[in-house]
Each structure stands twice: as structure tokens, then as C-alpha cells.
Amino acid sequence: MSKNKLSASSGRWLKEHFDDKYVLEAQKRGYRSRAIFKLEEIQNKDKLLKPGMTVVDLGAAPGGWSQYAVEQVGDSGQVIACDILAMDSIAGVSFLQGDFREEAVLDALLERIQPDMVDVVMSDMAPNMSGNPSVDQPRSMYLVELALDMCRQVLAPNGSFTVKVFQGESFDAYLQEVRKVFKVVKIRKPDSSRARSREVYIVATGYKG
């Protein structure tokens, strides 16, 4: 791709981004990213987050989901967040920076969590996209498998799980896997999710334990 084409493409993306009503609304309300509106829409429909809950937020940076979650769980709840990228501190959020795929980071995260104490695991994780679906999709599915494994280790009975998944190879098999361990499983495509994106959110409630 030529430099001019790249610049034109980048310019279009920037214009779309800054003209985006969700970006503007996030800035207006003091949230760190437009992604908060995806979680807000899920919350409005599925009521996953309640005062006093313990929540694990995977792929948390820059912190929009953690900001919203800590508002919902209140002072009596807690949010434990993890991301490979740095994240500015948020009151009420315990943040661990590290690569969730590495065993040492996973162990450090688990040290902050007692078994069966987590009410909600939420994941907005995504790999760095190469633009090649045959590479990106397996990387993405690996992350969502890890998120489901986290549920098996820390979720309380009847706990909930919401995870971003890209539709493509292995999506149906993953959905069946989630259905084995949760009583109710729904697929959400929030209005704030860009139409061209293959992303959807699996919302699972009633962890069987």
C-alpha cells in the first residue's frame, strides 16, 4: 500500500472516529472509550451488574468497561481488571498489567481472586489484527477460550459472563461450549458496535459451576 493510500485511509478512519456520536458522547460523559456503550446496552437488557458484586474485566484498557462496572457495583463491590497495556488508575478498580496468555500473569490475577467469589467475568479482549482472517480468527478464539477458562476457575454458581467474539471459524463450536456451562446464553450485537465489524457479544448467565 502506498504512503498516500495509507494516509487517505487513516484520514477517513480519523474523520469517522471523531464524527462518531458514541465517541462524542463518551467524551461528554467522561468515559475513556466508546466501548462503554456496548456494555451499557448489554446491562440495560441483561442486568448483569448489581451493587456489591465482584467483577473481573479482561482486556480492560483504556478502562471504559471498568469505569462503567465500578459505577454499577458501587462502594460495596469491586472490579479486578487486567490488560497487556497500561491503564490509568480508576477508583475502586484493582488493575494488573500483563499478558493474560502468560501463566505467571494468570497466576498473579488469580491471587487477587478467591475461588467462587466472582459474580461476573467480562472480556472485551481482541488480538492485534493483521487483516488476515486465517491468522486473526484463531488468535481471537484463543483469547475467548482463555476467558471461558477463567470463568471455570473463579465464577460463583449462577454467575455471569459476557465476551466479545468475532464470527467466523470455530464460533459455533465455542458457542456450544459456553452453553454447556451456563443456563442461558444470548448473542448481542450492540447498536454501538460498528455494522461492518464481525464482533458480537455472547451474554451467558446462570453459571452451572
Curated annotation (Swiss-Prot):
Output the InterPro entries linked to this UniProt entry: RNA_methyltr_RlmE, RNA_MeTrfase_FtsJ_dom, rRNA-MeTfrase_E, SAM-dependent_MTases_sf
Q: Which transformation does this protein catalyse, written as a reaction?
A: uridine(2552) in 23S rRNA + S-adenosyl-L-methionine = 2'-O-methyluridine(2552) in 23S rRNA + S-adenosyl-L-homocysteine + H(+)
| One annotated Gene Ontology cellular component of this protein | cytoplasm
Subcellular location, principal: cytoplasm
Membrane-crossing residues? none
| GO MF annotation terms | rRNA (uridine-2'-O-)-methyltransferase activity
Q: Does the keyword Nucleus apply?
A: no
**Residues that coordinate or bind S-adenosyl-L-methionine:** G63, W65, D83, D99, D124
Active site per database record: K164
Pfam entry (one): FtsJ
Q: Which UniProt keywords apply?
A: Cytoplasm, Methyltransferase, rRNA processing, S-adenosyl-L-methionine, Transferase
Annotated localization: Cytoplasm
Gene3D superfamilies in alphabetical order:
Vaccinia Virus protein VP39
- EC number(s)? 2.1.1.166
Superkingdom in the source lineage: Bacteria
The family note in this entry says: Belongs to the class I-like SAM-binding methyltransferase superfamily. RNA methyltransferase RlmE family.
Function recorded in the entry: Specifically methylates the uridine in position 2552 of 23S rRNA at the 2'-O position of the ribose in the fully assembled 50S ribosomal subunit.
Under PANTHER family, the record lists:
RIBOSOMAL RNA METHYLTRANSFERASE (PTHR10920), RRNA METHYLTRANSFERASE 2, MITOCHONDRIAL (PTHR10920:SF18)
Protein name, as recorded: Ribosomal RNA large subunit methyltransferase E
Q: Which gene encodes it?
A: rlmE
